[in-house]
Amino acid sequence: MPGGAALGWILLGGLVLRLWSIKHGLPYVYNVDEEQHFVPHAVNMVGGSLNPHYFENPPALTYLLAAVFKLRFHAGFPFGSSGIERSFLRDPTAVFTSARVVVALLGTLGVGLIYWAGARFYDRRVGLVAAVLMACAFLPVFYSKQALNDAVTLVPLTVALVMCLAVYERARWWEWAIAGAAIGVAVDVKYTAGAMVVVLAIAAFGRLIEKRLTWRQLLTGGAISVAALVVAVIVLNPYALVDFSLFKHQVLNQAGTAGSSGKIGQSSQPGWIYYIWTLTWGLGWLPLIAAAAGAVLAVWADRVRGLMLVAFPILLWLFLGGQARHFGRWYMPAYPAITVLASYAAVRAADAVPLSWVPRRRTALVVAAGALLAVQGLWTSVRVDSVLAHTDTRTLTRQWIEHNVPPGSGLVVEPAVFPARFLKVGSPKHSYRLYPIKPPFQAYEKHLTPALIDTYRQQGYCYVLVASYQHDRGLNAGFKGARDYYRALAAQSQVVARFSPYRFGARPVRFNFDLSYNFLPRAYMRPGPLLELHKLNGCQ
């Protein structure tokens, strides 16, 4: 099959995987980060100020979504007001679906750019294998279904990677400029992408060492790249300067939180081991092994070119591994380089087979190598896509409560499990009374004691909804108060409804901040936590 046609089929397949179950959970958004970080700020921008007033994550995706919402819903200038804010509060389905489709399309664009990167660093065969791997890899597919910046970051990062190679090969002024601008755009999508400047430095100094660049040319080109980077950062994040005190406060606060305090119930593994483990399922076992081999082969064959691919994944791994909090998606910016390295190793392995066959047989070996690299990702992506197609346990729980618990009843709902306003149905007079849980919600499990149950009963909060997301975190952390609370609750109540995400007969999945939210383990039949609704004994 010609390369262009093959790439077209790969892109189509990658898009299908990313659009499958794209409306999962809606009209409710169960991923807390997706619910809070980008889409609500973009909606506010449509008819208001372009200042996001939020810098914990950079705003490039927010601005893009705001522009899409303007065009999609004919809202804000120059269309006039269309009440997008009110309709978003009533039913956010259309807005979140639009945002997710944008991310899915950008994720698919990333697949095409991975082909470009593989072809530019080596040849078209490496590019096609890399594209297949990225099209199917579980973590890029999964986060292309969320209105988050993780999959989006791969687009400017891959462009930056290729343009750094162009600087190493030719070092024309516009290549310096595009490399710097691409890094700047990547930083405005995800701050950790800034480490890509090291790859640009490797390209520049590699050319200098090979005496294909003078110091004057290096300084001139470097100045062009830095200027382009700064311009890109300012254009896509102008209020970082206008509202610098807020920008500085939020970024430093976020960095301090991620670097100094782990999440309650988090794995005790060192971060460096944790991120290697995430590659075994986020990308796949064979791709991980192939990437390690590819790193050695690439550096051996061409030191500078190989280091350009190896440097960013290693730097990001060292930095993230030293943080207190660990999430598999945080390491996704390293996936483009890792994918190219794995594909390079696969093609080298196919070429090493001593065959005197016609070239078509050799091509078949490359196809087989690519299929082997991609099969784990394809299998897990298809399986999780089918899981997401089922109704979430939280939606089932809400439906049961609406039909079986009288309006006005008092409910205790554990925090950070349901979206805002999830159980506030009907008019205020007929909605449920929710027990006021004081923030910070991340410390909820620390403050649990059996005495709370008497408080619930005295104040008429007769129903207590327990979610495995909170329950398991408290027990994993070893909090005695949480353990005693859940034991007392079980002894002083009856479970009136139970909604499980697991297949019949499957063992519950041990809580993990990745696997419990991406539903990768085979035990899952539907998305969501295990939920139990307790009715307190002797409560009126």
Give the ranges of each region predicted by the language model.
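Short helix- or helix-capping micro-motifs
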Residues: L11-L17, A130-A135, V162, I183, ...
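Start-transfer (signal-anchor) and selected internal transmembrane alpha helices
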Residues: M1-W20, L109-G112, A119-F121, L128-V129, ...
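Hydrophobic/aromatic-rich transmembrane helices and adjacent perimembrane loops
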Residues: Y143-S144, D150-T153, A186, Y191, ...
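Membrane-interface transmembrane helices that cradle and orient dolichyl/undecaprenyl
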Residues: M1, A119-F121, R125, A160-W176, ...
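Signature aromatic-anchored transmembrane alpha helix within multi-pass, membrane-resident enzymes
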Residues: G8, V198, A223-A227, V231, ...
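Catalytic lumenal/periplasmic loop and adjoining terminal transmembrane helix
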Residues: L19, K23, P27, Y239-L241, ...
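Transmembrane-helix motifs of polytopic, lipid-linked glycan transferases
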Residues: L89-T93, T97, V101-Y122, V159, ...
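Transmembrane-lumen/periplasm boundary regions of multi-pass, lipid-linked membrane glycan transferases
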Residues: L17-W20, H41, Y63-L64, V185, ...
